[in-house]
Amino acid sequence: GQGSQKVGMLAELAEQFASVEATFAEASKAVGFDLWHIAQSGEGLDQTEFTQPVLLTASIALWRVWLELGGVAPKYLAGHSLGEYSALVAAGSLSLGDAVKLVNLRGKLMQSAVPQGKGAMAAILGLDDAQVVALCQQVSSQAEGSVEAANYNAQGQVVIAGEKAAIEAVMALAKENSGKAIALPVSVPSHCSLMKPAAEQFAEALEQTAIELPSIPVIQNVGAEIATDVAQVRQALTAQLYESVQWTKTMQFIQDQGIQYVAECGPGNVLANLAKRLPNIEKAFPLDSKSRLEDALNAILVAEGKIA
């Protein structure tokens, strides 16, 4: 998801695997601008209309390297927010070209939905989900503006989104209730009702995009469920703009299926670190370097009994 981008991402891996830059070239041709240049120079990387296609392409480049090295296909795929698109590409539901065009548009619509400086997001730590929801409802009812739980990332870690004044009010209340509050450096309040106008326009683009049923089950952000038809894929991608990311439930679903190994295709290791906190996850691997890719590959092959 957004926030994991960094200037120069995948540069070292690109020197070792030609498929990395080839993937960026394929995606760049679809959107009409140079995604690899943005990733390496940082020019425009903080603008969501560029951030989103760059990150999606980086995730798919890592996925392709994983397969190139002989990595096994997972039982399930899931992606956090923007990452749901990467998961759908990996599952053959969306083409890479269509996906990068969609998320480029998604970024533009999200940015235009809320005037610059009006929206905000913050991470609330150390309070349970119900406490955070109650604080959001309290502030919203006092006419301080709209604020909602946007991302349920883990136990004791909820991200809120909404109007700036309301976000600041919830942050203050969280601290009064022995929680921590950290403002996030974003200009767009994702996954809240302020994004409904963007979602309505985005739904039209989704209707015109070829989408297949995923060949590998993709756990959706909204509801933490598996789509059983293409209409549900479209509906979930539309609703995802203004409804909460249910990552805690997603990871619980994975554990309930008996999954013990998790691999993260994207720059950084935020999701792998969240997975490591879960009792039934034996190992969680980030795949953003050759050594990490090889470590994950060997561990999973050993676990499956394919190598000793």
Name the predicted role of every residue range.
Residues 283-307:
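Short, flexible loop segments at boundaries between secondary-structure elements
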